[in-house]
């Protein structure tokens, strides 16, 4: 009997440990909205995260967004970590030691290649500058918008031909001078 009690006590201890471990690791749960964002920020830390998996990752499941996976289905830690961005250091390791071996770059190495004397770019630029000098936008010369141009021209002509009903003088009338009788003492 004593051995049976020890085995039973050992089984109860193991069962308690197993239940505690399952609760600690947790089963998959659903996360939505702010809870999902907070959890992603906690899991990913400074790396940041994506709402859809980046291209090139090992996709076991069909590429769904994290909202569909975690809000409508169950979500666990491993799944959350697949949506974390890669750290900057792992993508490109530019430590001070690796930069020491690089030669100094000067401005001449970044100059644009020179265009030919009569390249298409120069012809296009000359045509556009000629259009601007003539002050006629290309949209008004287009056949499709010609009716709009004619309407604008008619409106301008109507404004030029409009005459006001009353013509106001361009100068103010002279101020009336006060007569000496009006300015004298009044009794």
From Swiss-Prot:
Keyword tags: Disulfide bond, Growth factor, Mitogen, Secreted, Signal
GO biological process, one term: positive regulation of cell division
Residue ranges of the region described as D: 86-91
Region (B): 25-51
Region span, Disordered: 162-187
Propeptide, chain numbering: 92-187
Gene Ontology CC entries for this record: extracellular space
Location, primary (coarse class): secreted
Listed InterPro entries: IGF2 (IPR022334), IGF2_C (IPR013576), Insulin-like (IPR016179), Insulin-like_growth_factor (IPR022350), Insulin-like_sf (IPR036438), Insulin_CS (IPR022353), Insulin_family (IPR022352)
UniProt-annotated stretches for the region A: 64-85
C: annotated span: 52-64
Signal peptide residues on this chain, from the entry's feature table: 1-23
Gene3D superfamilies, sorted: Insulin-like
One Gene Ontology term of the molecular function aspect: protein serine/threonine kinase activator activity
Subcellular location: Secreted
Disulfide links within the chain: 32-71, 44-84, 70-75
Chain positions of site Important for interaction with integrin: 47, 57, 60-61
Role according to the record: The insulin-like growth factors, isolated from plasma, are structurally and functionally related to insulin but have a much higher growth-promoting activity. Acts as a ligand for integrin which is required for IGF2 signaling.
Family that this chain belongs to: Belongs to the insulin family.
Protein name (record): Insulin-like growth factor 2
Organism: Gallus gallus
Gene name of the record: IGF2
């Amino acid at each position: 009997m004593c051995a049976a009690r020890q085995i039973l006590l050992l089984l109860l201890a193991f069962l308690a440990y197993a239940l505690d471990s399952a609760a600690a690791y947790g089963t998959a749960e659903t996360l939505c909205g702010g809870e999902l964002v907070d959890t992603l920020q906690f899991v990913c830390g400074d790396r940041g995260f994506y709402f859809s998996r980046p291209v090139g990752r090992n996709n076991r499941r069909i590429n769904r967004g994290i909202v569909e996976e975690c809000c409508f289905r169950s979500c666990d830690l491993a799944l959350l970590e697949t949506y974390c961005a890669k750290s900057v250091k792992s993508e490109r390791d530019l430590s001070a030691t690796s930069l020491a071996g690089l030669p100094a770059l000067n401005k001449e190495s970044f100059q644009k290649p020179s265009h030919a004397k009569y390249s298409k770019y120069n012809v296009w630029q000359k045509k556009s500058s000629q259009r601007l000098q003539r002050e006629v936008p290309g949209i008004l010369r287009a056949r499709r918008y010609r009716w709009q141009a004619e309407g604008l021209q008619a409106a301008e002509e109507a404004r030029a031909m409009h005459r006001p009903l009353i013509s106001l003088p361009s100068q103010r009338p002279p101020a009336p001078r006060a007569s000496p009788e009006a300015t004298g003492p009044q009794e």
